[in-house]
Curated annotation (Swiss-Prot):
Functional note: Part of the ABC transporter complex PotABCD involved in spermidine/putrescine import. Responsible for energy coupling to the transport system.
Source organism: Lactobacillus gasseri (strain ATCC 33323 / DSM 20243 / BCRC 14619 / CIP 102991 / JCM 1131 / KCTC 3163 / NCIMB 11718 / NCTC 13722 / AM63)
Keywords, comma-separated and alphabetical: ATP-binding, Cell membrane, Membrane, Nucleotide-binding, Translocase, Transport
The family this protein is said to belong to: Belongs to the ABC transporter superfamily. Spermidine/putrescine importer (TC 3.A.1.11.1) family.
Protein name: Spermidine/putrescine import ATP-binding protein PotA
Oligomeric and partner information: The complex is composed of two ATP-binding proteins (PotA), two transmembrane proteins (PotB and PotC) and a solute-binding protein (PotD).
This protein's GO CC annotations: ATP-binding cassette (ABC) transporter complex
Catalytic activity: ATP + H2O + polyamine-[polyamine-binding protein]Side 1 = ADP + phosphate + polyamineSide 2 + [polyamine-binding protein]Side 1
Residues the entry annotates as binding ATP: 38-45
Pfam families, sorted: ABC_tran, TOBE_2
PANTHER family: SPERMIDINE/PUTRESCINE IMPORT ATP-BINDING PROTEIN POTA, SPERMIDINE_PUTRESCINE IMPORT ATP-BINDING PROTEIN POTA
Topology in membrane: Peripheral membrane protein
NCBIfam families: potA
Length: 363
């Protein structure tokens, strides 16, 4: 796939001295679903606004299909945005809202009618053309906003926290629908969110941001299974993170025990952090466990039990299990070498990728 959006060395500093973006470099390929994921103030919405043309970078360049659009007006970019509050016109009905952009462009009336009908069909709102905006649910208003954006046939669609106002059930439904719409249209979606589950569920690629920097980028599986640092490991899903020490390639020490692992390329004796995901830990009898822990609490969350336990060194453990246990009971915890992920302090994403490629190539 060809690159459609590229940001090179983009920095955004405001008049009060606050730096929202620090040397952002990212590439967006055509036809994929991307998420910009991070906490409040991480810079994700600032990136979206710079891509849309609503804000100019202090330095750096923005490219669209190889052309420098850094200083190009937002109206001249082949990019549309769906805002968090949908920005629908309450005095217009559904048809008029969706048709608005085409009418501004002075398109033929019959052409507008057909385009609006097709856009509403795409978002499953057939028969809603004459409805008033006030008569629609939050999910239906979301669909109207998307229809209004896609009717203009943009090359890129930007979505700014556009599911955050919906309830949990409707949000999950819309995640599926957005993904299906993107696949049908074949255009690039860039979705801004602070919700890890949304990003993991919908995206082909994720950019994880914090404090104005891209912490890690990659597929949802890669980012979840191979977090590059402590922030990513904690922000993307639940994690058990312990201090450790590398013994040698494929062997690490933590919790006063040595374990076989799947990591290499780290100096023997180097201090590291070790990540174990709660769902990768199995409760077993003490004899078959690699660790011995005491169960402190247990919550039933519908599809699993969330168990909190503590070992003899007072390390706290979070375990997700489909089977309950007893509070106060000593149990064994089992995990495979591949379940251990070792992180180096201060290792950049580029350094991490290089190390990973080196030892995977030796296997």
């Amino acid at each position: 796939m060809s690159d459609i959006i590229k940001l090179t060395h983009v920095r955004k500093e405001y008049d009060d001295g606050f730096v929202a973006l620090k040397d952002i470099n990212l590439t967006i390929e055509s036809g994929k679903f991307y998420s910009l994921l991070g906490p409040s103030g991480s810079g994700k919405t600032t990136i979206l606004r710079i891509i849309a043309g609503f804000s100019e970078p202090t330095s750096g360049q923005v490219f669209f299909a190889g052309k420098d659009i850094t200083n190009l007006d937002a109206a001249k970019r082949k990019i549309n945005t769906v805002f968090q509050n949908y920005a629908l016109f309450p005095h217009m009905n559904v048809f008029e809202n969706v048709a608005f952009g085409l009418q501004i462009k002075k398109k033929d009336k019959q052409e507008i009618k057909l385009a609006v009908k097709e856009a509403l069909h795409m978002v499953q709102l057939d028969g809603f053309a004459n409805r008033e905006i006030s008569e629609l649910s939050g999910g239906q208003q979301q669909r109207v906003a998307i229809a209004r954006a896609i009717v203009n046939q943009p090359k890129v669609l930007l979505l700014d926290e556009s599911l955050s106002a919906l309830d949990k059930r409707l949000r999950k439904d819309m995640q599926f629908e957005l993904r299906e719409i993107q696949k049908k249209l074949g255009i690039t979606f860039i979705f801004v969110t602070h919700d890890q589950e949304e990003a993991l569920a919908m995206s082909d690629e994720i950019f994880v941001l914090n404090e104005g920097k891209i912490q890690q980028s990659g597929s949802p599986v890669d980012i979840y299974d191979e977090p590059v640092n402590d922030f990513v490991a904690r922000f993307i899903g639940d994690s058990n993170i312990l201090s450790g020490r590398m013994i040698k390639d494929y062997e690490v020490e933590f919790g006063n025990h040595r374990f076989e692992c799947a990591d290499a390329g780290i100096k023997p004796g180097e201090k590291v952090e070790v990540v174990l995901r709660p769902e990768d830990l199995d409760i077993t009898d003490i004899e078959h466990g690699k660790l011995r822990v005491m169960v402190e609490s247990q919550l039933f969350l519908g599809d699993h039990f969330e168990i909190k336990a503590i070992d003899s060194d007072e390390n706290e453990w979070l375990i997700h299990s489909t089977n309950p246990t007893n509070i106060g009971k000593e149990v064994g915890v089992y995990f495979d070498p591949e379940d251990i992920h070792v992180m180096r302090f201060g290792e950049s994403e580029a350094e991490f990728d290089k190390r990973l490629e080196a030892y995977e190539g030796d296997e």
